Amino acid sequence: VLLDGFIRKFVLCPECENPETELLVSTKRSTISQGCKACGYHSPLESNHKLVTFILKNPPNLNPAVQGSSLTEGKRSKRSKRPNGDTNGDTSQVDDQNESLEASVNENSKNGDDDEGHEWQADVSEEAVRARMQDLTEGAKNMTINDDLEKREKDRMDIFYE
C-alpha cells in the first residue's frame, strides 16, 4: 500500500497515468514540479509530504555526467578489479577484433571497393519496364495487370462488397 501510494504520487503522471514523469527541483523557490514526457503535463507536487521536504533539503546533482550513474557503481568497480589492475573480462581480445575490422574497412576503401560511381535508381525507360514485366512470375502479373483495371471505378469498388 505504501509503495502504491509512492508510485501514484511520484512516478505516474496524474493526467495520463504513464510512468514517464520527471521531477524538477527548484531549490530557490523550494518547490518540486512533476513533468510528464509522454503528454507534456506539468504540475507542482504537494510540499507537505516528507519525501518532498527531504528532496528539497538534499537536492540531486545537476552534473549530467553523474546523473545516470548508479549509487552502487563505485562499490562494484572496486570489487571487480583484479590485483594486477585488470578488470573482469579480457578487453585485449575486443581491441584486436576492432583493429582487424578497421583494417579491413580501410583496405576496402583503398582498393576502390566502395560504391562510388554506381547509380542506384530504377531505369524507367519503356524497354527496361518491359524487361522487368517479363521477369515477373505469372501470378505476380495477374496481381498487377488484370481486366479489372478496364472497368469503371464504381464497378471496381463493387468488387470489395461482393
From Swiss-Prot:
Keywords: GTP-binding, Initiation factor, Nucleotide-binding, Protein biosynthesis. Residues 85-109 have a biased composition (Polar residues). InterPro entries: IF2/IF5, Transl_init_fac_IF2/IF5_dom, Transl_init_fac_IF2/IF5_Zn-bd. Coiled coil: none annotated. It holds the Pfam family eIF-5_eIF-2B. Residues 59-162 are annotated as: Disordered. Residues 148-162 have a biased composition (Basic and acidic residues). It comes from the Eukaryota. GO terms for molecular function: GTP binding; translation initiation factor activity. Belongs to the eIF-2-beta/eIF-5 family. Catalyzes the hydrolysis of GTP bound to the 40S ribosomal initiation complex (40S.mRNA.Met-tRNA[F].eIF-2.GTP) with the subsequent joining of a 60S ribosomal subunit resulting in the release of eIF-2 and the guanine nucleotide. The subsequent joining of a 60S ribosomal subunit results in the formation of a functional 80S initiation complex (80S.mRNA.Met-tRNA[F]). This is Eukaryotic translation initiation factor 5. It comes from Tribolium castaneum (Red flour beetle). The lineage of its organism: Eukaryota, Metazoa, Ecdysozoa, Arthropoda, Hexapoda.
